[in-house]
């Protein structure tokens, strides 16, 4: 992808060492390294865009990491992040923010590319979602569009991270976001991709119903609670809006138990129901994908796209062969006769 708060993401655990090697030159002022090509890119929280026969991948990392591909089989990892210098407002809004940017999302709307990103510190909900834009992905410079939304400890019961843009059937822009606390939030946006006047966030999904008390303890944070849901992504298909979310815990390498669930609605702002008819605000969600324990221990933080006549699902997976490092997972989406998405296998 996500959000009016800060969140539950130890993005620093499995991918940081890799990305610090790639981007250390951007921090040190030394000459930039050359791009390199890989068929198995290490990513966290990947999102994708397509323009002029080129795929672009953006993911968590110092200043937002980026790579390109012509075929989605081999990827050129670019040595420079999107932002080598973070906007001043990010440090002012999020004390302790270290420029390790989480969970971007990107979309084209009204002739521009818009990229949202998360600024936070692990396990707390003092967070912010920033915005960049430019006319073309090939254009060299992203324009700083400021902050979309912030969350504050003690003020908000949601976390402003993991943004996801969705444009509805009436060409209206919306944004979802969220991680733990009171779950997945949503607001309507104006034409500048900021929160529309008078809009207030509404909860559209929780891991558990708010009335539930018998839920597993949170092993990663004493602040965020047990509502282990995050990383929303809404995908339009055949008159439905499909809300994908990630359940449980990321960012612990081979100890992660992340997995993906889905629900759907005829209306962009819900209610989203799972295949059994349970509202996702009450803990509903149909399991869509989890680790197969052969190739991946766990999978999550997904995105879905319709590109070149194909529906594509991407996420990161904690690779068993790579000792729990997170790598890119890509699969074609299939559809049941009654309109539910599925993947045949993960391998």
Question: Where are the language model's segments positioned?
Answer:
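Bacterial N-terminal signal peptides that target proteins for export
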Residues: 2-14
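Detector for intrinsically disordered, low-structure N-terminal pre-sequences
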Residues: 5, 21-24, 36
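Enriched but not universal
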Residues: 9, 25-26
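Sec-dependent N-terminal signal peptides
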Residues: 12-23
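Carbohydrate-active catalytic/glycan-binding domains of CAZyme proteins
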Residues: 27-347
């Amino acid at each position: 992808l996500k959000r009016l708060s800060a969140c539950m993401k130890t993005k620093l655990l499995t991918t940081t060492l890799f990305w610090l090697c790639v981007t250390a030159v951007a921090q040190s002022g030394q000459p930039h390294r050359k791009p390199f090509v890989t068929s198995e890119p290490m990513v966290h929280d990947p999102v994708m865009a397509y323009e002029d026969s080129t795929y672009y991948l953006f993911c968590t990392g110092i200043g937002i990491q980026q790579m390109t591909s012509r075929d989605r089989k081999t990827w050129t990892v670019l040595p420079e992040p999107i932002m080598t210098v973070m906007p001043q407002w990010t440090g002012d809004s999020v004390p302790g923010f270290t420029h390790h940017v989480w969970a971007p999302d990107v979309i084209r709307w009204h002739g521009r590319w818009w990229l949202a990103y998360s600024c936070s510190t692990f396990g707390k909900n003092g967070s912010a979602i920033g915005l960049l834009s430019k006319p073309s992905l090939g254009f060299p410079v992203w324009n700083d569009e400021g902050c979309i939304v912030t969350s504050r400890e003690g003020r908000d019961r949601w976390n402003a991270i993991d943004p996801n843009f969705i444009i509805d059937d009436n060409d209206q822009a919306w944004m979802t976001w969220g991680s733990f606390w009171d779950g997945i939030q949503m607001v309507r946006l104006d034409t500048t991709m900021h929160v529309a006047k008078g809009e207030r966030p509404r909860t559209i999904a929780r891991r558990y119903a708010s009335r539930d008390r018998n839920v597993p303890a949170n092993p990663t944070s004493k602040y965020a609670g047990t509502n282990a849901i995050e990383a929303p992504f809404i995908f339009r298909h055949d008159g439905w809006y499909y809300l994908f979310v990630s359940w449980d815990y990321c960012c612990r390498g081979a100890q992660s138990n992340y997995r993906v669930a889905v629900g759907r609605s005829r209306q962009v702002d819900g209610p989203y129901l799972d295949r059994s008819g349970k509202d996702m605000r009450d803990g509903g969600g149909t399991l869509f994908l989890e680790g197969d324990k052969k190739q991946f221990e766990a999978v999550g933080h997904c995105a879905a796209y319709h590109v070149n006549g194909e529906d594509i699902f991407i996420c990161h997976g904690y690779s068993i062969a790579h000792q729990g490092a997170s790598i890119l997972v890509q699969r074609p989406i299939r559809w049941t006769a009654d309109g539910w998405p599925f993947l045949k296998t993960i391998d």
